[in-house]
Structure formats: C-alpha cells, structure tokens
C-alpha cells in the first residue's frame, strides 16, 4: 500500500525535469508561449532564493525509440534526440535571460561554441551564484532517457528532489486519459511505481532514485504557478519517496 501523504517542506536546490513535448505545445518545434511561461515560473522561483537546475527532453524534435521503429539505428537516432534537447536548452536560456535570470547551458556532448561541457563542480558553483544550470544532450550516450539523466544529474549536483513536470496532475493508478476511474496518489514509493508498472517515467530513473533515496515530485506543468508550489512544498501532484 502507498503511504499517506506527510507534511511537505520547501526545497533549497532542485532538479526540474521538463518534457520536450510540452516545449512544442504538442507539435514539432518550439512554442514560444509555452517556453515563456516556463521561464517566468523558473524566474519566480530563482528570485525567491532557490537553486534550480533543469533537464529538458527533446521529444518535440526527435524521439530515438520511435525513430528506431521506423528503421533508423537506435544509437544514431538517440544522438539526434540529444541534439534536440540542446535546441530546447538554448531556447530556455534565451527566455530566462529576458526575465533577467543568469543561466548556463552544460552539455554532455562537447559543443564549445554554444555551451559549457558538463562539469558537476562547475554546475554547483553556478547554482551557488544564483544561476540556472540547464543540462543538455542527455547523458551523452545512447539508450539512456532524459528521465534517467535527470535522476543522475540530481544526485551528482546534490539536489534535494527531482521535480518531474508532466502534462498530468501526478501519478495515477491507471492512465486517466483511458480510464475514468483512475485515481491519483498523494504519495507512493519508488518500488511501488516500478512493481505496478506505472508509466510516469522509465524504470531506470525510478530505480536510480530509489537506490539513492532521491525523492521525485510529479506534478502538472500546465497549471500556472505549479513550479513555485512544488518548490515550496505545497501538496500538489504526487510525492514519490522510499
């Protein structure tokens, strides 16, 4: 059985995972209105003194697993997806700067003209100086999702929680779009998510967080102000913890 919801507290350093599909507004490419709203919410949180790192997917440009089904080599299609994440990172950086928020993009694949290489200690120094650090190009290796990247980066930079922003309100007993009787968990363990096969993120990400006692908060990005609510510890979405 899942545990009852406990009192939640605010966080000081967070890793925000954003799905690339949402950056496209459900289409291929970038939706400036969506990116603007995300940047505004992140800026509000940073101004309150919270340190924010971000991992963005690339699903609005390429999805490696889907390209593989159409005949492309899986490793090569994954690299294409990594490049898509970098485009999203640069877009978010630009909109954050328009909000007056200093930011840095760090990529797992070296591309010195547009971003810094991924260096964990440098990322932590940026965070301590109030800069948003945006991680691009996934893990830099095929077969690893950006959800797994978010879990790994959160652990390496010493984040207190992974804030997993989705297009749904939290973790449900079943897909709420297909099953009208599905109910949302207020709190659940990593193991329960994995054992029940709940399709929130890939099992590797949840397993990594479970092994290292990293909590995950799943919430709806499309609700205005939810990033700030999640950071402050309000009872929104689903808290996944051991």
Curated annotation (Swiss-Prot):
Q: Has UniProt tagged this entry with the keyword ATP-binding? A: yes
Per the record, the major location class is cytoplasm
Q: Which domain of life is it from?
A: Bacteria
Q: Where does UMP bind?
A: 58, 78, 139-146
| E.C. number(s) listed in UniProt | 2.7.4.22
Instruction: Please state how the activity of this protein is regulated.
Output: Inhibited by UTP.
Pfam families recorded: AA_kinase
Binding-site list for ATP: 17-20, 59, 63, 172, 175
Check the record and name the InterPro entries matching this protein.
AceGlu_kinase-like_sf, Asp/Glu/Uridylate_kinase, Uridylate_kinase, Uridylate_kinase_bac
EC top class named in words: transferase
For this UniProt record, the keywords arranged alphabetically read as follows:
ATP-binding, Cytoplasm, Kinase, Nucleotide-binding, Pyrimidine biosynthesis, Transferase
Q: What reaction gets catalysed by this protein?
A: UMP + ATP = UDP + ADP
Q: Which cysteines are joined by disulfide bonds?
A: none
Q: Where in the cell is it found?
A: Cytoplasm
Gene3D superfamilies in UniProt = Acetylglutamate kinase-like (3.40.1160.10)
Keyword Kinase, does the record have it? yes
UniProt GO molecular function: ATP binding; UMP kinase activity
Q: Which GO terms describe its biological process?
A: 'de novo' CTP biosynthetic process; UDP biosynthetic process
Q: What metabolic or biological pathway is this protein involved in? A: Pyrimidine metabolism; CTP biosynthesis via de novo pathway; UDP from UMP (UMPK route): step 1/1
Q: Which GO terms describe its cellular component?
A: cytoplasm
Q: Which family does it belong to?
A: Belongs to the UMP kinase family.
Tell me how this protein assembles.
Homohexamer.
| Known role | Catalyzes the reversible phosphorylation of UMP to UDP.
Q: What is this protein called?
A: Uridylate kinase
Q: Which organism was this protein described from?
A: Rhodococcus jostii (strain RHA1)
What lineage is this protein's organism placed in? Bacteria, Bacillati, Actinomycetota, Actinomycetes, Mycobacteriales
| GN (gene name) | pyrH
């Amino acid at each position: 059985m899942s545990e009852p919801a406990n009192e939640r507290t605010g966080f000081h350093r967070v890793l925000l995972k954003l799905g690339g599909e949402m950056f496209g507004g459900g289409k291929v490419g970038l939706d400036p209105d969506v990116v603007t709203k995300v940047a505004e919410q992140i800026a509000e949180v940073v101004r309150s003194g919270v340190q924010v790192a971000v991992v963005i997917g690339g699903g609005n440009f390429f999805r490696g697993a889907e390209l593989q089904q159409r005949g492309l080599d899986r490793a090569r299609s994954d690299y294409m997806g990594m490049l898509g994440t970098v485009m999203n990172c640069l877009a978010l950086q630009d909109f954050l700067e328009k909000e007056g928020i200093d930011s840095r993009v760090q990529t797992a694949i070296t591309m010195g003209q547009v971003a810094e290489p991924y260096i964990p200690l440098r990322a932590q120094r940026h965070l301590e100086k109030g800069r948003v650090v945006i991680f691009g190009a996934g893990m830099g290796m095929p077969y690893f999702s950006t959800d797994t990247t978010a879990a790994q980066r959160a652990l390496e930079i010493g984040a207190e929680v992974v804030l997993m922003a989705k297009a749904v309100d939290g973790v449900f007993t079943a897909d709420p779009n297909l099953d009208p009787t599905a109910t949302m968990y207020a709190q659940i363990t990593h193991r329960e998510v994995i054992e029940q096969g709940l399709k929130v993120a890939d099992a590797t990400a949840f397993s990594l967080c479970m092994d290292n006692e990293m909590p995950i908060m799943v919430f709806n990005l499309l609700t205005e102000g939810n990033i700030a609510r999640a950071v402050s510890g309000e009872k929104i979405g689903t808290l996944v913890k051991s």
